Amino acid sequence: MGQFEELLAIDSTTGDFRPIQNYVKEQIEEMGYQSYETHKGGILADLGGTGNSLVITAHLDDIGLMVRFVNPDGTLRVAKVGGLSPEDALGENVRVKTRDDRVYTGTVQKKFASVHVTEDDVAAKPLDYATNVVVVLDEDVHNAEETKALGVDIGCFIALEPRLQVCNGYIK
């Protein structure tokens, strides 16, 4: 599982795939092969051999989120990157990467998370990244200025924590 765990630990949100791309290129070169990068960021490697050619392909990037706005209370309004529905994202632990490569952890949650103090009509609304789903940072921030002082601002990529578990030989 070692290398699989290494791969999952590399944040690779679509649009921020260079770290995993570099990792795969290094692995190919450590095996003694030369890698080539396509104009769209793909990696090719000729493993040699004779006979019919075989092509193996795989995605290196992953679905995630992006900071769309820093709310006045310091939470983050986000946009999906890829096909991540708000229902599936809710409760996920995340890593927010700043432009200068600092990383902060947080959690995706409802904007009004407390069911005992939220009006029924507000709580009943469908989940939507634009209106009622936010990322709360694991930092002592209370307003937009404090969040932005961390380097977290519009356009920062947000990766989901992979939560790797192996149970009875099954990967979760």
Per-region residue spans from a language model:
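N-terminal hydrophobic/helix-forming segments and targeting peptides
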Residues: 1-172
